[in-house]
Amino acid sequence: MIYWIFLGLAIIAEIIGTLSMKYASVSGEMTGHIVMYFMITGSYVMLSLAVKKVALGVAYALWEGIGILIITIFSVMWFGETLSPLKIAGLVTLIGGILLVKSGTRKPKQPNCHRGNRPPSVQELKTQTTGHHKGVAVESGEHHAAA
């Protein structure tokens, strides 16, 4: 649950940072740039914490997609940017994509408790893909006969 909170904080920080960038470019104030630097940095830190348990593709899609949606809404309200029918169609498509990516995520049935949080070894990956256990798999190429 905490990792989803990290993702939410990453999204909020990205939105604030990006809107601050626009504010700084419109107003010329240095404060906007300072806020932008801190928020974008914080966003990446929070995102890196979130992807420890949230699938990277899902986390990135939500982080970027939700950010784009909210930034677009605030850009229209605060900065007078226009929202053409084509942009609206793009945003609707984006929402559909986010929903598909999120709904396509499922948890593994049984975690690999024997290896903890470390990534699988090369041998474990070979076993998973070939179904052979250590010492049983025959490497492709030459077969050696016993002399």
UniProtKB/Swiss-Prot annotation:
UniProtKB keywords: Cell inner membrane, Cell membrane, Membrane, Transmembrane, Transmembrane helix, Transport
GO biological process, one term: spermidine transmembrane transport
TM region(s), chain numbering: 1-21, 31-51, 54-74, 81-101
Membrane disposition: Multi-pass membrane protein
Main subcellular localisation: membrane
Keyword Plastid: no
Stored InterPro entries: Small_drug/metabolite_transptr (IPR000390), Small_multidrug_res (IPR045324), Spermidine_export_MdtJ (IPR023740)
Role played: Catalyzes the excretion of spermidine.
Subunit architecture: Forms a complex with MdtI.
PANTHER family referenced in this protein's UniProt entry, alphabetically: SMR FAMILY PROTON-DEPENDENT DRUG EFFLUX TRANSPORTER SUGE, SPERMIDINE EXPORT PROTEIN MDTJ
Protein name: Spermidine export protein MdtJ
Organism, as annotated: Yersinia pestis
Gene encoding the protein: mdtJ
